Amino acid sequence: MSFENRPFVKKDLLRVLSQYPTFLNESKELVSKLPLNAKGLHRINFANGRITLSLIYGDLNETLDELKNPLVKYDAWYLDGFSPAKNPEMWTAEIASYMAAASHSETTFSTYTVAGFVKQNFEKENFSLSKLKGFGNKRSMLAGRSSSTQKKVIVKKKTIGIVGAGIAGCSLAKILAGRGHNVIIFDKEDGPSKAATGNPFLVAYPRLSAHDSPYARFSLHSYLFSSRFYDDMNTKFWKKSGVLMLGFDENSLKRETALCNARKDEVLFEKLSKKSASEKAGFKINHGGLFFKDAGYIDPERLCEEMVDDVLIEKKFKEEVQVIVKKSDHFSLKTKNDEYVLDHVCLCNAFMVNQFTNLRGISKKRGQVSYISTNATLKNLKFPICAAGYLSPKNGDKHLIGSSYSKSDSTKLIQTEHDENLEKINIIYDQNIELKGGRVGFRTVTRDRLPLAGVIDGIHINVGHGSKGSTSAPLCSEYIADLIDGTVPPVDSFVAKALKPDRFKIRN
């Protein structure tokens, strides 16, 4: 974990790291994954998830409260700041107290400063201290050890059952297997991503706000994490094409203006005029917008198949879970054919989650995607365009447009919903549109449009991603994996509280 109040821009960090040619490859990977300057906690994975960096952008004293977690203890602290005389806010008694509370019996710390008041702060927290010879051009340094009686927690390899093989379930399976756990994933369909997700195309992009709120912070950080997550897979089923979001009405233009006023560096997005948007798309568009270069689209079924292609993941497709029973030290999960003994159970089964729980604030929404024929104008479109609806790049001989949003339970294509999709797409493209069918799927949405991620009665929950699962699910899966392991979570307490699965019960 690292706190950075004034983060490097990439070109400056490259210049600094160039002084250490021994670590050239590691330096390049770090710089390539360095998140943009946005307040909050960023999770970066290296070595196929075996090494994690939790990078917190913001003032140390302001962010500490958001990171307090009684279950997480750190092995070592390294305090590297300007001298206390120049940077006194980093060396406060409150920080020493936080470090003591977040340490176990084997935790150590070190720092180059040996200032008297710094030593006093750590002595008050019962750290044992030693003044040592410094390193390099430093004359001396301070080292210490925690006096905590809390034992260090060793992460043990476990057997974990996942119910549901959509993006949420498959990304969680991949992350857990990457950490060495044995995973059994169950789904009543004959393969991954067959039910709620189902479409051959999903856009991965953020819905941002210029204001700091749980929704805004989660939307930004899940977008940045999902883009890195798919990059790390090195898969052909993720296209980092960028996504163009048009400013087409009063609300979208107001949001666009607020975002542009909040971020002027064009690192997160590039503002395009109507002319520039048309040139980039390859056909005339009547609106400008924001182009998100790190966004893109996935083939969810093929991508999910890759995610669960691991020797540590046992796939139980066409096997519906019937009963889950919590025992004193394990779970018993029963299907029609067998019974499984598991250390943990994770429910990633969308609107079927209440077969085993009693969650409030969630509902099932129908979504119909329409297919239109490609043509000489559209065939060269390389990235999705979003407005009231979306237009995809070519998929075979067609494009996807959509999507409707209704309470209907019908699995049949409905002409009025095709008409609704065609009306939405007219904002983007209104020439020579030929309808070629479509597909119906169902989403699980929540009352506040944030997913449900966390633990209830010992069962881990990862549902309620709505139409944004391609963006939101990977970060929630990383969060669930850290809850299971008792390691540093990838979201701060501000966001974790907003994701709590029982939050609607609490509000009621």
Question: What are the functions of these language-model segments?
Answer:
Residues M141-A143, T149-K156, G161-R179, K188, ...:
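Active-site substrate-recognition segment that forms the wall
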Residues L290-K336, Y340, H344, C348:
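Helical element adjacent to the flavin cofactor pocket in flavoenzyme catalytic cores
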Residues S110, P214-S222, F248-K254, G289-E306, ...:
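Short beta-strand to alpha-helix junction loop
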Residues A210, T235-M245, L268-V308, S404-S408, ...:
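Helix-loop-beta segment of a Rossmann-like dinucleotide-binding subdomain
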Residues T92-S105:
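A short glycine-rich, Lys/Arg-flanked "PGG" loop and its adjoining helix->strand segment in the class I
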Residues V267-F269, I433-N508:
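C-terminal catalytic lobe of FAD-dependent flavoproteins
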Residues F201-K280:
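Dinucleotide-binding Rossmann-like beta1-alpha1 core, especially the glycine-rich loop
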Residues V16-L67:
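S-adenosyl-L-methionine
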